[in-house]
Swiss-Prot record:
Chief subcellular location: membrane
Record bears the keyword Metal-binding: yes
Membrane topology listed for this record: Multi-pass membrane protein
Source taxonomy: Eukaryota, Metazoa, Chordata, Tunicata, Ascidiacea
Organism, as annotated: Ciona intestinalis (Transparent sea squirt)
PANTHER family per UniProt: CHOLESTEROL 7-DESATURASE NVD (PTHR21266:SF32), IRON-SULFUR DOMAIN CONTAINING PROTEIN (PTHR21266)
Family of this protein: Belongs to the cholesterol 7-desaturase family.
Pfam families: KshA_C, Rieske
Listed PROSITE patterns: RIESKE
EC number in record: 1.14.19.21
Protein name: Cholesterol 7-desaturase nvd 2
Cofactor(s) recorded in Swiss-Prot or TrEMBL: [2Fe-2S] cluster
Amino acid sequence: MLIEYLIRITVMVITSERLLILMGLCDESFHFPVMIRVVFNAAVAIVIALVMSKLYKVLFAPLDLRRKLEDVGYVHHDHSVSREENIRDTQRRKKLGNTPPVFPNGWFKVADSTWIKKGQVKSIYFFGEQLALFRNKRGLLRALDAYCPHLLANMAAGGKVVNSDCLECPFHGWKFSGETGKLVDVPYAQKVPTFVSVKKWSCCEVDGMAYLWYHCDGGEPKWVLPSSVTINTLKYAGKTEHIINSHIQDIPENAADISHLDHLHKPVIGSDVEKTNESLLNNLIFHSIQASWKPPTDPNEPHRSTMSIKDNIHLSIFNIKIPLLYLEFEIDQIGPGAVHIHVRTPFFRGLMLQNVTPIEPFVQKLTHSFYVSPWVPVCIAKAFYLLETTQIERDILMWNNKTYFRQPVLVKEESALAKHRRWYQQFYSENSPRMNHRGDLVYPGKPKLADW
């Protein structure tokens, strides 16, 4: 409001002085009092600063795009109800079908490494669990179940890192080892009960991101999450974040759904699937995509699969195709949640690090971090990746509004999709949590907590 007020004063000062001179009510030497001139100059300075700030963000600042659940991926045809009501109805009416377990086993991104400093405690919520993520005094990342087994206070809400590597509950000061999760101190007790502990989650940090290992049966990680081989030769260009209402398997399964690429992703611009054909540009310029998905070839790395995409962007006039741009994407899926996407264009090389993490059943957090050749201007990189983001948001519309069935109707040309489903089954186990027919989350083999 203050900035808007100053801008109005600026316009008023300029127009009023000139108007009085033109009307002959004062001569060319006329000026408003000094105080008004000071306000005018301050307003001009603020406007210039705002313009320069906007220009800097567009030209030089990395992309930082965050979409909430309600921002993208829903249709709103019935305007007699609000958009929020429409989204709730879509979620409520979604048929669950015979779905796989809701949380696969593997590594999942939970934060950027820079988000949590040495000695800090952060509250995070993933896999339907409240967790305490903290960095100990030596800089090592730790994660524990957030609820103290004493009186179930949330240790991530006011808890502190103490004794180099312990999390202290803010309620009564009970201290738990970040390395083991065991209770190590009760400040007012003569003897510490040795059988008390909280669940400790395995952590790692790769490419500037913090990951947790999820497994329904606990235990140590089954594989090491690798760093991207090209990231150290590229520069950071930004990131996007989307919250999605779907089963987690829908998202990586997209890689093996080859037939959708040349249909859903054929138009070059726009994330609104219902309006992409209204654009003149989309009726002239098209993607022509060839792709293949392959299961793992290395028996020592069954958790990895690959995909290759060749994308010819062409201008079509009277059915004559004129090539405009050729793109290649080499995609490495690592477990159920991490993907390295290597981008080749005629002008630069790029990298997208995609991560999908379950927040709770049928709610996923999808992030993309972007990197490009060092000499590429950030504004060019942002434009390229924003176009890629519009393609992702078309998929989100499909994911948010579809359901999942174990045995869909497939034609023989979709054999890769069936192979992908068989490959992905390795990330579920007998005790993986599931949704029952009433929509309740069930943990097989895990006793229910008794009401107190």
